[in-house]
Amino acid sequence: MTEYLSVSTLTKYLKAKFDRDRYLERVYLTGEISNFRRRPNHQYFALKDEGAVIQATMWAGQFRKLDFELEEGMKVLAVGRISIYPPSGSYSINIESLVPDGVGALAVKFEQLKKKLTAEGLFEQRWKQTLPQFSKKIAVVTSPSGAVIRDIITTVQRRFPMSQIVLYPTKVQGQGSAEEIAGNIRRANQRGDFDVMIIGRGGGSIEDLWGFNEEIVVRAIFESRIPIISSVGHETDVTLADFVADSRAATPTAAAELATPNTKVDLINWANEQEKRLFNRLTHVIKIRRERVDKLSQSVVFRQPERLYDGHLQKLDRLCERLSVLTENKVANMKHRYELSAGKLIPTYGKIVEAKKNKTEQLYQSLLLLDISKIKARGFSLVTDEKGKIIKSVSDVKKGQTLDVELTDGKVIVEVK
């Protein structure tokens, strides 16, 4: 008897087959991006070729690892796992990694980064620095063993041997080269005494030159305070470093020529130019000064010199008058203050003097009362022993002792009995 399967049963059976198939666990596909519309997190699109289409899913974590922008119609190489989605019965690829297809992958990265940096304005002419005419010190960022540095040294020594070359040995190809190039550009800027910088390498494939297309290198060149000459690859090779550099040279020799003057010709031209500029400047200054003298000579002051002092004399008179008024006012004010103070001080001083006079009289009368002659006149006497000691009490004397008695009109000697 024939057994009919439900759609769900068949779909589950096929899903189990897909899940157990080791070949479908990791599939390598090539195709074009179709129906792509960027979403905030996970990405859903399709891969197609001339004969078929397969739905594709890429989770946010994997999508963030891409170093290029997905675009509609882009040919890519995808690696992922095939699975069936039961509710719709459709199969799809869950993409784990994705890169542009073939040599075009780097070309895509190049164009996308160029577009991004152009939008930011990094390649605009207004940012370009002028190369110095006479470079005393030149920084060179390149490989120490290539023909580039030899060509630069030879050219500089031939054209302008006074220039000093400082080499920053740099890896210019392969993994880590971009970091070294950018790092040495920044180190040269930190040193701060270079007039110009040459960066470059010899020719090669797009992969060989790719270090000079990395964003880290482009931004280091843009941020450089030292004018930079780019000399990367052959004349037909173009890198993003060429776009952002202040000048581009087709060869290392051409770069060295841009960095140095042609000693005889350029020095003569420079001297002639400086002479011409100096002459024009002096002529201009003399003209300005002559016009100023002519203008001054026509002024009223030069025609009537005495008028030069009119204003100052008037100002001096006004100041003298003002000083006189201020002095009179000051004296009057001080006199008034003196009179006010004197009016208050004299009555007070009189009272103080009278009080002191009365006090003095009282003290004088008190002293008169204490005068010994006055005391004697009132009938008192001063008794002393033979040693001059004043006798104050009967107990101070003894029988037979001789005493001196001072009276008002003289002294008598008595004996105690």
From Swiss-Prot:
GO term, biological process aspect, one: DNA catabolic process
EC number: 3.1.11.6
GO MF terms, alphabetically ordered: exodeoxyribonuclease VII activity; nucleic acid binding
Catalytic activity: Exonucleolytic cleavage in either 5'- to 3'- or 3'- to 5'-direction to yield nucleoside 5'-phosphates
InterPro entries: Exonuc_VII_L, Exonuc_VII_lsu_C, OB-fold_nuc-bd_dom
Cellular component, GO annotation: cytoplasm; exodeoxyribonuclease VII complex
UniProt keyword annotations, A-Z: Cytoplasm, Exonuclease, Hydrolase, Nuclease
Cellular location(s): Cytoplasm
A family per Pfam: tRNA_anti_2
Family (UniProt): Belongs to the XseA family.
Subunit description: Heterooligomer composed of large and small subunits.
Function: Bidirectionally degrades single-stranded DNA into large acid-insoluble oligonucleotides, which are then degraded further into small acid-soluble oligonucleotides.
HAMAP family membership: Exonuc_7_L
Protein's recorded name: Exodeoxyribonuclease 7 large subunit
